[in-house]
Regions:
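Conserved AdoMet
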Residues: 1-104
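Conserved class I S-adenosyl-L-methionine
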Residues: 98-111, 116, 136
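Conserved beta-strand signature within the Rossmann-like core of class I S-adenosyl-L-methionine
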Residues: 234-242
């Protein structure tokens, strides 16, 4: 993009931040520009000013655009092999030191990830009857958090869930959707939080931040991972997405124990 377009983009991001509460300055500039441009073209906007008018006049478009930018693609047991590794290796190692685990799902989207944690823990109680847990789940998107609290899911979100687990932990409705059972939902607290601005309170044994920061600038990622390190208990686990790597993780006090998993040392 030329200099004028850069100025227009900077102007738009400031206006959009004030309108929607999502600060785009922390995201990789060129990638975010391409995503916004593709969305603008799909909506028939002639430029940033025209697109801003569309957003100001249509709250539904604001929500849809935020979802587009924050990539609200979510389903239960995403990357099943990683969840198997979590339940077979990392959680038992944590339970060898304590019976009560605190989990934070940072960037929980519509709730599939924190509910997956809860289902995993419930199933693990067969071998670990003393296991207790609490789950804190946050997202920057108000609509996503509302959907997570509602706990109602269509078939695509359940594609990686074994049928017996669907029968055990969900209730089907006449429309073909499935609602998470209250016994699971009661162990999770959902909250609105911008990872760039919010304070990280509490201490956790597991923090999951998967496929959330892929468009963040590298310096923002590094700062965020440092804050996660501070929020973890000693020996705690940071669970990332399949394409995410912490460069120079040892400088932050992490040990890369396997793909997607970092341990606080």
């Amino acid at each position: 993009m030329d200099e004028n377009t850069d100025i227009q983009y900077s102007w738009f991001t400031k206006k959009f931040s004030a309108l929607a509460g999502l600060d785009l300055a922390h995201y990789k500039c060129q990638q975010m520009k391409r995503r916004i441009k593709s969305y603008m073209q799909a909506k028939g906007a002639s430029g940033f000013a025209d697109f801003l008018k569309m957003l100001e006049n249509n709250p539904v478009t604001v929500v849809d655009f935020k979802n587009f930018l924050t990539i609200n693609v979510s389903y239960f047991f995403r990357d099943t092999d990683k969840w198997d590794e979590m339940s077979n290796n990392h959680v038992p190692a944590l339970l060898s030191r304590k019976n009560t685990l605190a989990v934070w799902s940072a960037g929980c989207s519509i709730g599939c990830e924190p509910y997956t944690f809860a289902i995993m823990f419930e199933e693990m109680r067969k071998k670990h009857p003393l296991l207790k847990y609490s789950i804190f789940a946050t997202d920057v998107d108000l609509e996503a958090v509302a959907a997570a609290k509602a706990g109602m899911y269509a078939g695509d979100a359940l594609k990686s869930v074994r049928p017996e687990l669907i029968r055990k932990y969900f209730t089907a409705d006449p429309g073909g959707k499935h609602k998470i059972n209250g016994s699971i939902a009661n162990n999770i607290k959902f909250s609105l939080l911008d990872l760039h601005k919010g304070r990280f309170e509490g201490k956790y044994d597991i923090i999951a931040c998967r496929n959330v920061v892929i468009y963040f600038e590298e310096n923002i990622k590094y700062e965020l991972y440092g804050k996660f390190h501070s929020a973890l208990n000693p020996g705690g686990i940071l669970f990332l997405g399949g394409s995410e790597i912490i460069f120079k993780s040892e400088e932050l006090g992490f040990k890369n124990i396997s793909m997607c998993f970092y341990q606080k040392v």
